[in-house]
């Protein structure tokens, strides 16, 4: 059927109107979100140099579909870095690269035992329970104490998978003690369907004490799944995260997920591999740690000089 000219004109006029946005960004006077970085401290000149090197040395690799586990050069660079920085002796073959922790979590959930109950730290990073809720997974809150995740709370729950952040808990800042880490590993070894998801986010930024080796490095029973991201150590816009799977889970992943395309940019993966290999990444971390330490000390001085906040327990 035909449409009359007046109706067409009305349709065009309607289409030309600006629709209301479906989502509006909030505007804040001060931003205290915990996952931000100091964008001005991003190593722009070094990153540009690295990108130019990658663009000049690689051709088809940058535009072809990447390996579904991630670019091999980056997986090897990450494995070497984890050995130096976290005491982890892992094979690049057990590392999976993805564009975000959320993406990797989606893949991980499909590998874990069916009918699993997930445990999340309370208080803790709210995004983790939201992921469980998004997939309709049962989860329990696991209380914290001064040593880390409460073993009593964990045992009282029906959880067989627990998500922990032993190196730097958010928001309490607790560092899980070596003894509690051993207790967690013993708990995981007691049943075949138990796993620990170690979220090592922010592990690079320890100022007053020496880092404890990663929980994964202490695991003799292959029950720890290690996850981390470069969003805090570099920038949120560099969408590269990774997980280290126990070999048994990795075999399942290869068998079941090899048809997936890798979600991270190949060009950025090659650039990050080079950035880690030539030492630029660790030098950048050293500069960031110095800056954050100084800023933290300055903030504490200001708080202690102020009468607005009791300072007797601030450290």
Name each model feature, range by range.
Residues 1, 198-202:
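Conserved acidic functional residues
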Residues 1-52, 258-265, 273-276, 282-294, ...:
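N-terminal basic, amphipathic alpha-helical segments
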Residues 36-39, 168-171, 202-205, 259:
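Short histidine/acidic/glycine/proline-rich micro-motifs that form metal-
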Residues 47, 220-290:
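Conserved core segment of the aminotransferase class I/II
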Residues 51-54, 61-192, 203-204, 210-218, ...:
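Conserved core of the PLP fold type I
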Residues 91-92, 313-315:
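Short Gly/Ser/Thr- and Asp/Glu-enriched loop/turn motifs at secondary-structure junctions
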Residues 122-132, 159, 195, 255, ...:
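A generic "structured core" feature
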